Amino acid sequence: MIDGVLEIVDKHRPLHLSIVGGDPLVRYREMETLIPLILEKGVHIQLVTSAFRPLPEAWASVPGLNVVVSIDGLQPEHDERRKPATYERILTNIQGQNVTIHCTITSQMMRSDGYLERFLQFWTPRNEIKRVWFSIFTPQRGDSMEEILTPSERKQAVADMLSLRERHPKLDMHPKMIAEYLTPPESPESCVFSMTTKTISADLTTLITPCQFGGDPDCGSCGCIASAGLKAIADHKLGGMVPISAIFKASIAIGRLVSGEERPPVPQKAEFPILR
């Protein structure tokens, strides 16, 4: 596995590599070996975990490594959904660390007044927490799941985040990024994140398309924080005139022309429904 990942890194030469679920810490011995080798290549790493086991002590101060702990809401909801990675276990396993907390906002949360603030009040005072991020639940097209936010709930979630970031500085999300949750990309072809990333499954061969959600994501309901962040950058206009998105798209087109790479077609049905 280690050699395979390093081969992929050498082939694609990414600026950033995310290692995500299941849970990378299932292979914690390989992670302890692999992460320094990737960092030596100048690649920033983001490792997403449930923190079901203790994090290596050295990870608390490794430059270029961001450990993200996924939390599914407040303790009652999270513990029911994430056993054995309960709040109690997470708090024990992140002691002495320096982690990012990530939570995906669902409709159930928005139906409970003050839910997001209570979440921040629990996590942000802790020394181990350097920042908190919120995503919004992203469905596949045609889904009718209880977690899907209504349009009014999405607007309220954005308003809440904009307000909460003023009172909770560890909610490390720029206002323009938060606002992008109201105008997500219409398709993978117009999503800067989808266009600039490559997602590879655990077999180190299978590509997950059209983005990390796989299958047929409902882009109009996208709540991906990475997509929102890159769209906020892409929408910025240099000199107030030229949107950065034009530079992104031109660079991508040139890169594909030089490499001979073609963008894979969007699948007709969900094949890799991963990661929320």
Regions picked out by a protein language model, each given a short descriptive name:
Residues M1-A58:
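Conserved alpha-helical substructure of the radical SAM core
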Residues D10, K41, L65-S194, D235:
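Radical SAM enzyme [4Fe-4S]-AdoMet core and its adjacent flexible, acidic
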Residues V26, P54, P76-E77, K231:
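Short glycine-rich, flexible loops that bind phosphorylated cofactors or substrates
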Residues F52, L74, G215:
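A generic "binding-loop/recognition-motif" signal
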Residues G21-P24, I105, M109, Q212:
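Short loop or secondary-structure boundary microenvironments that flank
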Residues P14, K83, P125-E128, L149, ...:
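Generic surface-pattern signal
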Residues S187-R276:
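Flexible mid-to-C-terminal extensions adjoining Fe-S/redox cofactors in radical SAM and related proteins
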